[in-house]
């Protein structure tokens, strides 16, 4: 599908505190939006709004010109969400985690899962229980999903957390390649991106921070 995501007059409150208001932006094929701002400025809340996990205080989000609330099926098909937590099961192996996660959307073959783990530097860790992995390795298990799923919209909350220098460089390249191939990325990160696609821009929520 050709992605067109629009925020119009978007506002969000948490615990009776205004995080942001009157946000207007549009995202399409090839775009990357980095959301920045101090802690507590609403970065994760904005991601959750765009992913359909929260409702805005005011304004609306449109997908393909229609309200997001009316596009649940289309959003589920278009979206890959990876939150700040790795979101994996400690007692499952790396392969089992990816098999389970993919089964929720689009099942993947064992060969594809092993190739994805190799792509994130985890060759040889396929059968290792995730509770024995380091934080960086657990994060890479979660990020291996980016090598398996092909939805156009990737929404990622602090994806570079716990990655080493090589992992950061590999992820930057993969995100840029996704945009160059017509995908869309929305992310939060405190990391300064070295590789940015032509459709990159930044949205700073700091102006509303108390």
Swiss-Prot record:
ABC transporter domain ranges (all copies): 3-205
Cellular compartments per GO CC: plasma membrane
Compartments reported by the entry: Cell inner membrane
GO process terms (BP): cytochrome complex assembly
Keywords, comma-separated and alphabetical: ATP-binding, Cell inner membrane, Cell membrane, Cytochrome c-type biogenesis, Membrane, Nucleotide-binding, Translocase, Transport
Protein residues bound to ATP: 37-44
UniProt GO MF annotations: ABC-type heme transporter activity; ATP binding; ATP hydrolysis activity
Entry keyword annotation includes Cell membrane: yes
Annotated membrane topology: Peripheral membrane protein
CDD domains from the UniProt entry: ABC_CcmA_heme_exporter
Pfam families: ABC_tran
Catalytic activity: heme b(in) + ATP + H2O = heme b(out) + ADP + phosphate + H(+)
EC class (word): translocase
Binding partners and assembly: The complex is composed of two ATP-binding proteins (CcmA) and two transmembrane proteins (CcmB).
Protein task: Part of the ABC transporter complex CcmAB involved in the biogenesis of c-type cytochromes; once thought to export heme, this seems not to be the case, but its exact role is uncertain. Responsible for energy coupling to the transport system.
Similarity-based family: Belongs to the ABC transporter superfamily. CcmA exporter (TC 3.A.1.107) family.
NCBIfam families: ccmA, PRK13538.1
This protein's name: Cytochrome c biogenesis ATP-binding export protein CcmA
Native source organism of the sequence: Pseudomonas putida (strain ATCC 47054 / DSM 6125 / CFBP 8728 / NCIMB 11950 / KT2440)
Taxonomic classification: Bacteria, Pseudomonadati, Pseudomonadota, Gammaproteobacteria, Pseudomonadales
């Amino acid at each position: 599908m050709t992605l067109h995501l629009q925020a119009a007059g978007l506002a969000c409150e948490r615990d009776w505190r205004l995080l942001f208001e009157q946000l207007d932006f549009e995202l399409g094929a090839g775009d990357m939006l980095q959301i920045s701002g101090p802690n507590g400025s609403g970065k994760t809340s904005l991601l959750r709004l765009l992913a359909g996990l929260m409702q805005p205080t005011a304004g609306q989000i449109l997908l393909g010109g229609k309200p997001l609330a009316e596009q649940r099926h289309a959003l589920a098909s278009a979206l890959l969400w990876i939150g700040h937590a790795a979101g994996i099961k400690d007692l499952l192996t790396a392969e089992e985690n990816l098999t389970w996660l993919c089964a929720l959307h689009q099942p993947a073959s064992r060969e594809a899962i092993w190739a994805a783990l190799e792509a994130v530097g985890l060759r040889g860790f396929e059968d290792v229980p995730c509770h024995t992995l380091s934080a960086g390795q657990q994060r890479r298990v979660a990020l291996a999903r980016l090598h398996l799923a092909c939805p156009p919209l990737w929404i990622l909350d602090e994806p570079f957390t716990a990655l080493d220098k090589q992992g950061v460089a590999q992820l930057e390249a993969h995100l840029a390649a996704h945009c160059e191939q017509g995908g869309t990325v929305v992310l939060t990160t405190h990391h300064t991106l070295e590789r940015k696609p032509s459709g990159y821009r930044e949205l700073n929520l700091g102006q509303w921070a108390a």
